[in-house]
Amino acid sequence: ISLGIEPARIRVISRDVGGGFGSRNVIYPEYVAVLWAARKLGRPVKWTARRDEEFQTTSQARDTLLRGQLGLTRDGDFLALRVDSTCNLGAYHTGNGPFTQLRNLTRMLPGVYKTPALYLELIGVFTHTVPISSYRGVGRMEAITLLERLIDKAAAVTGIDRIELRLRNVIPPEAMPHTTPMGGVYDSGTYSANMALTREKA
């Protein structure tokens, strides 16, 4: 459309490009500029980003500010999780980029724990940086890092052993399939056994 050419007349030849890890899922403005230049000059145009240009143009991930609160009983049973998140979406929209960041963060927040209630406030902010998009598990590590740090903090405040606190709240095998407050479904898993084994080997 940008070039005034019918889509059926455009041929894309894609050779082996190696692993993508998400950053190659995006149509970047530079692609359009190269196509426009080729059309204007009437000859093939090739653009290969230098390493420093790659960091200035290719989508990235994980520029997120998270604040959370974990509510639990005196016995250490999780009651609720509240999270306020501000996500840097970059300077422009990259297709599914912002959606992927916010969706993955949302779905991963309960982790593998029984959390009856969850409140989440998400704010996406456009800035002057490179765009956020699918890149090496975008949104997932941010959510789990926050959750696990909250659990460690709760263990310190309550005096309950940090592994024991997790074992009390992890989704048991007999509860499978388990649907989280955010709609994610765990169909199977033996998380308590894995934690017990980790403790034994530590």
Predicted regions and their residues:
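Structural alpha/beta core scaffold segments of enzyme domains
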Residues: I1-A202
